[in-house]
Amino acid sequence: RGLGDVYKRQVYTDKVEAYYRKNISKKLAIEALKAVKAFYNGESFVDGTSGESLKTYIDFIVSKNNLSNIYLSQQINDKFNNSEQMLLQLNDNFVEQINGNLLQFLYTYDAIQEGVVKLKTDMLSVLSIAVDYVDADGD
């Protein structure tokens, strides 16, 4: 969020999550990532039980169709785990992080984007979900 236009190297620290309560930026980012990971893996927020999920459906489709990408579901989880590890290394205050060590913040952003690519291209392809330009918002 606080990166502004990454490709133009414009940084907007006032766009970080929890700008007015800066010491929880990292906590919110980690919780958001955990929520996406839990949804992907079919984990309940209420009692921690697991059920059917995008992961189990990917595994089913891959095995049913003898697809070569047998490790896709694990690759996606690996991206989630790597992103979380990268986030844990950041300052709790993303404004301070960006101003103090932008490069580390950008590496974390890149790690998260690798997961987005796995979800929005590889997973959708395996699940035979077509996305048109209106749905592809440029994440």
Residue spans of the language-model regions?
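An amphipathic alpha-helical core segment
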Residues: L33-L102
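Generic detector of bulky aromatic hydrophobic side chains
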Residues: R1, E17-Y20, Y40, V126, ...
